[in-house]
Amino acid sequence: MIRRVLVANRGEIALRIVRACRDMNIDMVAVHSEADADGLWATMATRRVCIGPARAGESYLSIPNIIEAALKTGCDAVHPGFGFLSENPDFARKVAENGLIFIGPGADVMARMGDKSAARAAMTEAGVPVVPGSEGVVDSIEAA
């Protein structure tokens, strides 16, 4: 059972996740940059952790900082929210490698579905109807 979740996002996305977890009696850890310390999602969470400076590349996109925050605060799971690292298979893999639950699709699924050609092939193989289009990677403008 999940007892504590770290939300690896900010703003209204993080706020929505914080509220949902609160409704389910799950402790919530919010991460924030130095500039976002007073963000509503951070103040409403059970705990909050600063993960770096205002620049997103040094905070919200820093996989090591987010993993460290989750481990230091005793989280069971990480919710990526939307954008930032939510579709990054390396992030999902690192979360799992550190013994945490990634709330979202697995790294392998993300990697496969993130490649349109591979996703189309997987859906066709599974018998899912796909819209007409190329059967593989288009290698020239003329072919497109």
Each language-model region and where it sits:
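N-terminal beta-alpha lobe that positions the nucleotide/phosphoryl donor
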Residues: 1-144
